[in-house]
């Protein structure tokens, strides 16, 4: 950039080839500036031969004068900030067919450092060393004289920065220093390269565009002027008539002002999966009216209250409800019923995953029968491995898919439709397993104890119990209600006939000596 300035013969750059010409031409330019002080008059600083007829007029000069009277300030940031007012000029006197390059630079206006105190600018010391000058080349360069003269030439994209290591080509300035923008019109020469010393150029300076760079506005009058005239500063303007009118409309009945806390409560309650039951039960008095269910039995809001005990006693009329009988095997996943508001559907249509804490309303005998079957079967599943069952269990025709281990919360209840039913065995005494011939070699050779053998058999029994739980009972499973739950306690290999010697104690077969040796 410094080489470019030397080539153009900038005033602060020593040029040995044409020093006298540059000194003579400013006098003529100063006479032009003194003779014409109208707002539309151009002010030229330096002009070379062949560029005499070019005139430049500052756009929005009145606005620049308003800022200049107060003391123009320009904000500089690390990322770069654009100027306001924008530097726009009108150029005339160019050769229509000749190509020109328009450049702009900002140079120090003096060698002082300033400070703002007592509502005025004053000199506080010597200026810091100036950074190497940077040139802003207009994006349309090079262009013909016709292109430059038919519209305003704007330097709106020029940015000011205080970052001395700026890599984006912004103009680097020091804070609290005074600067003067300059416009350069360079005649593009195809024979000579860009930046040749023989290239003709002219420089134009407008004193009302001088400003002081600052990181924040010091004079409140400058702040007010920029807010009033900058179209991008509408957010900083005060409550004028339009703003007051807009606020009055917002606070009217058409646009009620809702507190943010109320909005947050509504948003959080709508996203909660359990919020609708609580809000509908306690929030409105209209829930005392009865709503008809699918089975024709009415239920009130009192029926929907959760039970007082977390572990109710059997027969469990307030236990979780699983409507497996209403699901079809051919039902597609897209047809599954999802969570719906309570006011839109009846309780029997709700997903049991969310309704598990509520009691079942009084329904027909078919639903009660299925409910009791689920409770009895769960009791048998929970207590089968701890003690022999002493209470009768319903028949196999009542056994449905309502169990804790085989029913997923959102899918149908078909489990192992192609599996064979379990073979039912009569009751046998517990000691019969230790006298059978199939178990004698294992007990004598490996020295396994009775608890371990019984534990393995109970595991085998639990697997068969899971297989037999199907959603729709097979015809081959129809039996009388006299079938006891103890028939499921033993595997297939146990003989069905009971001989009298099987009721004797274990030591009569000769197993005690083997245990003593291995122990």
UniProtKB/Swiss-Prot annotation:
One of its GO terms (biological process) is positive regulation of DNA-templated transcription. GO terms for cellular component: cytoplasm; nucleus; protein-containing complex; protein-DNA complex. Residues 29-43, 262-303 have a biased composition (Polar residues). Residues 1-43, 254-312, 335-376 are annotated as: Disordered. The lineage of its organism: Eukaryota, Metazoa, Chordata, Craniata, Vertebrata. It is found in: Nucleus; Cytoplasm. The keyword Ribonucleoprotein does not apply. Its main location: nucleus. GO terms for molecular function: DNA binding; DNA-binding transcription factor activity; DNA-binding transcription factor activity, RNA polymerase II-specific; RNA polymerase II cis-regulatory region sequence-specific DNA binding; sequence-specific DNA binding. Residues 17-28 have a biased composition (Basic and acidic residues). Residues 63-238 bind DNA. This is T-box transcription factor TBX5. It comes from Xenopus tropicalis (Western clawed frog). Keywords: Cytoplasm, DNA-binding, Nucleus, Transcription, Transcription regulation. DNA-binding protein that regulates the transcription of several genes and is involved in heart development and limb pattern formation. May bind to the core DNA motif of promoters. The T-Box domain binds to double-stranded DNA. Monomer. Homodimer (via the T-box); binds DNA as homodimer. The keyword 4Fe-4S does not apply. InterPro entries: p53-like_TF_DNA-bd_sf, T-box_DNA-bd, T-box_sf, TF_T-box, TF_T-box_CS.
């Amino acid at each position: 950039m410094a080489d470019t300035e030397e080539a153009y013969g900038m005033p602060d750059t020593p040029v040995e080839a044409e020093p006298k010409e540059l000194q003579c031409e400013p006098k003529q330019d100063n006479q032009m500036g003194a003779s014409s002080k109208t707002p539309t008059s151009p002010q030229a600083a330096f002009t070379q031969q062949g560029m005499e007829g070019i005139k430049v007029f500052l756009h929005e000069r009145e606005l620049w004068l308003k800022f200049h009277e107060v003391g123009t300030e320009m904000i500089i940031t690390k990322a770069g900030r654009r100027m306001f007012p924008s530097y726009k000029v009108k150029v005339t006197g160019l050769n229509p067919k000749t190509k020109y390059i328009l450049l702009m630079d900002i140079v120090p206006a003096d060698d002082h450092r300033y400070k703002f105190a007592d509502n005025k600018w004053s000199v506080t010391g010597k200026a810091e060393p100036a950074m190497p000058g940077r040139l802003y080349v207009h994006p349309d360069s090079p262009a013909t004289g016709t292109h430059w003269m038919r519209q305003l030439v704007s330097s709106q994209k020029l940015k000011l920065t205080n970052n001395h290591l700026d890599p984006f080509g912004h103009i680097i300035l020091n804070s609290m220093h005074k600067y003067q923008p300059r416009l350069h019109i360079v005649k593009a020469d195809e024979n000579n390269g860009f930046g040749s010393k023989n290239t003709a150029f002219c420089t134009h300076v407008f004193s009302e565009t001088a400003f002081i760079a600052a990181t924040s506005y010091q004079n409140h009058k400058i702040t007010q002027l920029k807010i009033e005239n900058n179209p991008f500063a509408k957010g900083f303007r005060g409550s004028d008539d339009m703003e007051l009118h807009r606020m009055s409309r917002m606070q009217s009945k058409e646009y009620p002002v809702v507190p943010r806390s109320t909005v947050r409560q509504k948003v959080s309650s709508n996203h909660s999966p359990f919020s609708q039951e609580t809000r509908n039960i306690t929030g409105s008095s209209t829930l005392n009216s009865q709503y008809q269910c699918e089975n024709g039995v009415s239920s009130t809001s009192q029926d929907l209250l959760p039970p007082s005990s977390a572990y109710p006693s059997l027969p469990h009329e307030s236990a979780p409800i699983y409507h497996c009988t209403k699901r079809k095997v051919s039902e597609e996943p897209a047809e599954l019923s999802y969570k719906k508001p309570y006011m839109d559907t009846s309780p029997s249509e709700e997903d049991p995953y969310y309704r598990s804490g509520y009691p079942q309303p009084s329904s027909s005998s078919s639903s009660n029968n299925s409910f009791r079957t689920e409770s009895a079967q769960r009791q048998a599943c929970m207590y089968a491995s701890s003690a022999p069952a002493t209470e009768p269990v319903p028949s196999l025709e009542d056994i449905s898919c309502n169990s804790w281990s085989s029913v997923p919360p959102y899918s149908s209840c078909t489990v192992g439709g192609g599996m064979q039913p379990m073979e039912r065995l009569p009751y046998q005494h517990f000691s019969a397993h230790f006298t059978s011939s199939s178990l004698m070699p294992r007990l004598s050779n490996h020295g396994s104890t009775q608890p371990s053998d019984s534990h393995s058999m109970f595991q085998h029994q639990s697997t068969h119990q899971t297989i037999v739980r199907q959603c729709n009972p097979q015809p081959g499973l129809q039996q009388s209600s006299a079938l006891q739950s103890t028939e499921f306690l033993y595997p297939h290999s146990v003989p069905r006939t009971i001989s009298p010697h099987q009721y004797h104690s274990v030591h009569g077969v000769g197993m005690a000596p083997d245990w003593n040796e291995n122990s």
